[in-house]
């Protein structure tokens, strides 16, 4: 869901008929067609969802990021991420006591969540960080899932075009 652009910017993509029905979540700027004490009428999408001054710097950064990934080719990025994910899964499965959560073959994502018996996920994250390997640890904004798994958290490795096997 990320395309290597700046933080704090995104795209709302949807069918026009649904966007027309969707209320704006903020107010201000050029999104207002007419306002009175009785009623506010909003512009049509996309203006309807653009409150305040747009972040022109982030918009430009997103455009450059999209040009970059387009030039590389999404198929090439996908193939690279899949190769890294496959390699990492092979390596992880060699670890005694490993528990890999929810990763089915050929699912298409480049994310692996795991734990190792008797080692706290944060400890694994700290050790990997000392080796120059960046991972996330914790509940990953999914506490109900983590509770269902019966664990305190997981280690999550995700792969992108900037990662290598090394």
Residues covered by each model-derived region:
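Pyridoxal 5′-phosphate
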Residues: 1-166
């Amino acid at each position: 869901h990320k395309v290597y652009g700046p933080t704090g910017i995104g795209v709302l993509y949807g069918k026009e008929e649904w966007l027309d029905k969707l209320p704006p979540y903020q107010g201000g700027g050029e999104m207002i067609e007419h306002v009175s004490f009785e009623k506010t009428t909003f512009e049509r999408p996309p203006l309807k969802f653009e409150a305040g001054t747009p972040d022109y710097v982030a918009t430009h950064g997103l455009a450059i990021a999209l040009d970059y990934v387009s030039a590389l080719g999404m198929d090439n990025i996908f193939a690279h991420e899949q190769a890294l994910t496959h390699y990492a899964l092979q390596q992880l499965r060699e670890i005694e006591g490993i528990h890999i959560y929810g990763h089915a073959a050929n699912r298409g994502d480049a994310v692996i969540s795991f734990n190792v018996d008797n080692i706290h996920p944060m400890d694994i994250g700290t050790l990997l960080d000392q080796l120059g390997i960046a991972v996330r640890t914790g509940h990953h904004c999914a506490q109900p899932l983590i509770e269902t798994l019966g664990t305190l958290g997981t280690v999550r490795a995700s792969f992108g075009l900037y990662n290598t096997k090394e």
